[in-house]
């Protein structure tokens, strides 16, 4: 998340986390492996039975922060895996036994514990909006930089999110007619309520704040973004 790890180190971190910590039945990534002993001299976490709270549970806050860091570094598929597993676990009522939402953690049986106690839900939403859909502010301007996977687009090859920016309701809709995966598409065209927005040569989109604040607040405005395949000569993921 701080940007310290090099790309190869990130790959190794993901490989290790998947090998030692990922448990789909429990809801995703555990905090640690089972040390098979009680270690009270190492603090609070080892005072719990394995699979509960800080000792090896699937801790929602840490998972969402891990996903956020992966997205920031361009590892969208790996970040999506972390978020989607949490969602699927929470939505599986027969196992999680909770109302819709993100609990503090999932225990060894995959049951959601301490509902509404965690900040993970806000981290989850922030990551989905600002990283997955790539809708975020920068020095007051509205920037678009999606990291959506091919399978996240619907039957119309569309993926959309509703946000409020500078008090203005906005729907951002991405159109991916080629159903390209992240890293294989680029932004080709952007329209704000049918008015075309300029795209910089490096294909980054930044809508000035004054253009947004001039919009009416009493209706939802629409930003349509067309994604097209990156030319084969430069078809590589940019981290």
Cite the ranges covered by each PLM segment.
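An alpha-helical repeat/solenoid feature that recognizes helix-turn-helix modules
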Residues: 1-6, 59
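Short, surface-exposed loop/turn segments at secondary-structure boundaries that line and modulate
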Residues: 44
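Non-catalytic C-terminal accessory modules of carbohydrate-active enzymes
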Residues: 15, 19-24, 34-38, 47-56, ...
């Amino acid at each position: 998340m701080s940007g310290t790890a090099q790309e190869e180190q990130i790959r190794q971190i993901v490989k290790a986390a998947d090998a030692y910590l990922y448990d789909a039945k429990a809801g995703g990534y555990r905090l640690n492996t089972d040390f098979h002993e009680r270690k009270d001299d190492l603090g609070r976490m080892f005072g719990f039975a394995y699979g509960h709270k800080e000792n090896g549970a699937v801790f929602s806050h840490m998972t969402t922060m891990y996903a956020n860091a992966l997205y920031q570094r361009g590892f969208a598929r790996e970040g999506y895996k972390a978020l989607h597993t949490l969602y699927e676990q929470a939505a599986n009522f027969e196992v999680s036994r909770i109302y819709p939402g993100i609990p503090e953690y999932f225990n060894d049986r995959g049951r959601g514990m301490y509902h509404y106690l965690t900040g993970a839900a806000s981290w989850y939403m922030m990551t989905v909006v600002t990283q997955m859909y790539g809708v975020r502010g920068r020095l007051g301007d509205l920037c678009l930089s999606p990291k959506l996977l091919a399978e996240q687009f619907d039957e119309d090859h569309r993926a959309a999110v509703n946000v409020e920016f500078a008090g203005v309701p906005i729907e951002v809709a991405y159109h991916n007619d080629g159903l390209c995966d992240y890293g294989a598409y680029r932004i080709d065209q952007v329209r704000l309520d049918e008015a075309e927005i300029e795209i910089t040569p490096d294909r980054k989109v930044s809508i000035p704040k004054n253009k947004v604040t001039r919009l009416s607040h009493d209706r939802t405005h629409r930003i349509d973004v067309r994604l097209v395949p990156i030319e084969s000569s430069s078809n590589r993921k940019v981290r």
